[in-house]
């Protein structure tokens, strides 16, 4: 009703099809538990993803824009593994950790969800135009900002409360002190949403905030496998149709690069498929990242 009070009387109002209100059945109920729930959500992309978000069947990933190479690699790897395991990956489409998480999810043919601090008709940063379009094609874009609305610095911090409310777990990959990612972690703790942290270089400024979370009951995340084992398969998990061919291609042992040449599949897809087979006890990863079938 707040949307209607802002935009006109009910008999004259026609709400656009891409605008969600709290009266819609697919409105994510987790948003209503917020102190400041959004008036509306503007969405672009796959509407079916909203059903999973409504049940908080997604994993949020946050971190600094000025990430280290290690942080970027971990974010992309986590996004890839979670996407391959069927988990929608929720982040903010910002520079650094956010973008790496989305790219990893896309590499595994997963479902990325971007909660923007800008209206949907704005791209920030501008060089993320192609990435934003790809996320919309394969997943979902969400924003509480009206089209044409001017962008304020506080909008980016405000969207943190939304991505936490759509997720069943939060991963902080890397962030300094006084980072927006720490706001997300605090909100997650208030909502009893588990917080996982990738341990970072103790001497690097960009890891000080995330490392400090490990002193406050956040769980250390040492590998994506741990998180997938804890969560299980996600809501959009697909049966691994390539499993027999993949196990056969391993032979006595093969790297992902060798499997790429043999099976002509992207590295992200192979990594997520191999992790699924590892969790099922069918393959094992040995030193040197050599994958081998498990002996009967």
Enumerate the language-model features and the residues they cover:
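Glycine-biased, small-residue-rich flexible motifs in mid-sequence functional cores and linkers
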Residues: 2, 8, 13-296
């Amino acid at each position: 009703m707040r949307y209607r009070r802002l935009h006109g009387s009910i008999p004259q109002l026609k709400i656009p099809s891409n605008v969600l209100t709290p009266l819609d059945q697919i409105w994510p109920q987790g948003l209503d538990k917020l102190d400041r729930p959004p008036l509306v959500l503007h969405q672009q992309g796959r509407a079916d993803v909203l059903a999973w978000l409504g049940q908080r069947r997604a994993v949020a990933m946050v971190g600094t824009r000025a990430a280290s190479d290690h942080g970027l690699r971990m974010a992309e790897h986590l996004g890839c593994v979670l996407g391959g395991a069927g988990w929608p990956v929720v982040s903010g489409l910002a520079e650094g950790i956010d973008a790496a998480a989305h790219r990893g999810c896309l590499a595994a043919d997963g479902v990325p969800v971007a909660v923007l601090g800008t209206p949907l008709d704005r791209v920030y940063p501008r060089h993320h135009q192609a990435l934003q379009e790809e996320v919309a094609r394969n997943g979902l874009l969400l924003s509480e900002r009206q089209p044409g609305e001017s962008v304020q610095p506080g909008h980016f911090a405000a969207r943190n409360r939304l991505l936490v409310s759509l997720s069943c777990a939060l991963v902080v990959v890397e962030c300094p002190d006084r980072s927006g990612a720490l706001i997300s972690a605090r909100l997650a703790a208030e909502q009893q949403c588990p917080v996982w942290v990738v341990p970072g270089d103790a001497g690097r400024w960009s890891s000080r905030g995330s490392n400090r979370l490990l002193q406050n009951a956040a769980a250390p995340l040492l590998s994506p496998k741990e998180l997938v084992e804890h969560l299980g398969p996600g809501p959009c998990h697909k049966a691994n149709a390539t499993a027999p061919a993949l196990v056969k291609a391993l032979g006595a042992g093969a790297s992902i690069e060798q499997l790429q040449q043999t099976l002509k599949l992207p590295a992200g897809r192979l990594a997520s498929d191999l992790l699924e087979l590892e969790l099922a006890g069918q393959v094992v990863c040995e030193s040197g990242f050599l994958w081998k079938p498990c002996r009967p």
